[in-house]
């Protein structure tokens, strides 16, 4: 369970609620070791593993791959209409393709400030674009900047090379 959880967290930083839930289960187990508590803990671990299975399948349910799902989660906000959610999914997929193409064109992109800035600007410009970017009536200027920064941090962390070593593990696990 712990290995699966760590893989999911490396792929998508917004899955920390699973980490917190797992830590709570383990802490409760360590607190008391009577038979009832142990049985309850194992039942809770089993339910938790089912939740991990569900989270693993969420990308498929959303019609995305794991890489696009991470960007979708970073872009999504509450109270979007179904049409806006579809648009955000399309933005996530297209943005990922754009960023990966840009990274591929720049050797050692993370080693120089100018190339890192270039990737950040690519992300910001894409999100601002009226045809391919975020719905302008749903995202303020500050929200676009915040999401662009969050996506850049995610890209910097998981794409030191292409293909990403974080998502390559998905095929192995």
Task: Show the residue positions of the predicted features.
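Catalytic cores and motor modules of nucleic-acid processing enzymes
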Residues: 1-173
